Amino acid sequence: MKKKLTQLTIALALALPLPAMALTVTTTTDATSLANTLVGSGVTITSATLTGAANQQGTFSGAAGAIGIDSGVILTSGDARLAPGPNGSDGDGASLGTAGDADLNALIPGFTTFDANVLSITFTTNTGNLFFSYVFASEEYNEFVNSSFNDVFGFFIDGVNIALIPGTNTPVSINNVNCGNPYNPAGGTNCALFNNNDLQDGGPFFDIAYDGFTNVFTASITGLTIGASHTIKLAIADAGDTVLDSAVFLKAGSFSSVDPNPVPEPATLALLGLGLAGLGLSRRRKAA
């Protein structure tokens, strides 16, 4: 009898849904620790430096259900501790009174950046390639879409920005990835790549504080010199004002020399086709 009760208890426990993980953030100013959180296969980190206030950056976990990345490093233009959801305000942010960044200024001619958060990593790669996964999120969605109040970020490898919309040369930004704003909801750009979490639109829909965020993107560069030192500068800042926060979530272990989304070789596709054809023939024979 006792054995049956134990088996029933185990069965019920397995049948119950697991509690959803919630996004948590642990702030740090240790650049090496942040860099080591990101490093993956085929990449060796030799040094790292950080520009940022005490609570501006850190590590995160439990975010898979919210943004599609479970854990990694968060860089913000304000306070990383404001990132966990649910979204309770359209105006979360921290004004730090710190300087902007010249490389980010160059991405938005005519505007000035503030409160820059910069993680610079010197590394080598054993293939000449680098890939990593990330999500960009902001409190400036959706009210400031198509305005000049757009926080800015960039991933500069040896000075070249690779924070681009997949398959294009267009930088990822609030104005380039959105579903419009409350005053012009039909005026979206790359809406399929955007996730709306705005209270004005009936949110929150995701367990994160930001009003909107992109899909998981993969940044990449090929043709680097194998074994040579290269530097990547991961930077984000307020632009136009210092009021609302934005963030970049970088996936743990995704700084890799191996493409996480490889395109199958033609021979592999041919073998897959033959396998499916054989499966279909086998099923027809059984039916006969």
Regions found by a protein language model. Name each.
Residues P264-S282:
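A short, hydrophobic C-terminal helix/tail in secreted or cell-surface proteins
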Residues L23-N261:
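Aromatic (Trp/Tyr/Phe) and Gly/Pro-enriched flexible surface segments
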Residues T9-P17:
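Bacterial N-terminal signal peptides
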Residues A15, P262-P264:
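Generic structural signal for beta-strand residues in well-ordered domains
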Residues L18-A22:
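Sec/Tat signal peptide C-region and signal peptidase I cleavage site
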Residues P17, N87, F144, D245-S246, ...:
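Short linear functional motifs in flexible/disordered or boundary regions
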Residues M1-T9:
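Bacterial N-terminal signal peptides that target proteins for export
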Residues R285-A288:
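Short, charged juxtamembrane terminal tails flanking transmembrane helices
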